[in-house]
Design a protein with these regions (language model features):
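Short acidic alpha-helix initiation/capping motifs at coil-to-helix transition points
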Residues: 87-93, 139-140, 159, 175
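Cytochrome P450 catalytic-core helices
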Residues: 162, 179-187, 191-203
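Catalytic-loop motifs flanking and including active-site residues across diverse enzymes
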Residues: 46, 90, 194-198
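Active-site substrate-recognition loop segments, prototypically the cytochrome P450 B′-helix/B-C loop
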Residues: 1-86, 95-113, 117-138, 147
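Cytochrome P450
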Residues: 3-5, 39, 99-108, 153, ...
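Structural motif
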Residues: 41, 82-90, 173-178, 192-193
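Helix-hairpin-helix/helix-loop-helix acidic hairpins
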Residues: 60-76, 142-185
Length: 203
């Protein structure tokens, strides 16, 4: 299946990567192009842009920082009183590391988690009465990252996800929708599985 993209396409306009996915028109205002929903060669080119961040060697170099932050978070937990593990540990550590990978201020770390939760719950009426309300939150995400994206185009390349996107030929001229789509892909990929793994690991 993975090797036969002509038949098993990942393109969003054909339904994307979800079984039973709904095809979208190219001019759909709420379509968010992202490389996970592209076929080769575009998928391969854009994926390779951010792959260096996640190779084993780089993750090993991040291990001391992760351990230090995890230790500090655990040291700050209340003693002999009930607390919310997900909020105070899982979300906190995940948010800190996401901010590091994007090289954005640590004080904005919970914004990244919030935007991940937003895109995960766009179709849930308990969170948003309409998908459009959720997209207003994502427009704030776009405005936030556009500022960094444009600034890093003008700065020397650095080893962070935004700079990688800003300097590679295949991603340096993305439309606002495509920038938002790929940023959301990276945020959700970093937030959802990591946060759930930390939470599930204590059960």
């Amino acid at each position: 299946v993975d090797k036969h993209h002509e038949l098993f396409s990942s393109q969003q306009r054909l339904g994307g990567i979800t079984l039973g996915g709904i095809a979208r028109e190219d001019d759909d205002a709420f379509a968010l192009p992202m490389f996970i929903q592209e076929d080769p060669p575009k998928h391969d080119k854009q994926r390779k842009v951010v792959t260096p961040m996640f190779i084993p060697r780089n993750l090993a170099e991040l291990e001391p920082l992760i351990r230090q932050r995890a230790g500090q978070i655990l040291d700050d937990l209340p003693i002999n009183e009930e607390f919310n593990w997900v909020k105070h540990v899982s979300v906190e550590l995940t948010g800190q590391m996401l901010a590091t990978l994007f090289d954005v201020p640590q004080e904005d770390r919970l914004k990244l988690v919030h935007w991940s939760d937003t895109v995960q719950n766009l179709g849930d009426p308990e969170f948003f009465e309409t998908p459009e309300q959720g997209f207003q939150e994502l427009f704030a995400c776009l405005a936030y990252f556009t500022e960094f994206y444009e600034a890093r185009k003008k700065a020397p390349p650095k080893f962070d996800l935004i700079s990688m996107l800003a300097h590679d030929e295949s991603t340096k001229d993305m439309s606002p929708q495509e920038l938002l789509g790929n940023i959301i892909l990276l945020i959700v990929g970093g937030n959802d599985t990591t946060r759930n793994s930390i939470s599930g690991g204590v059960l």
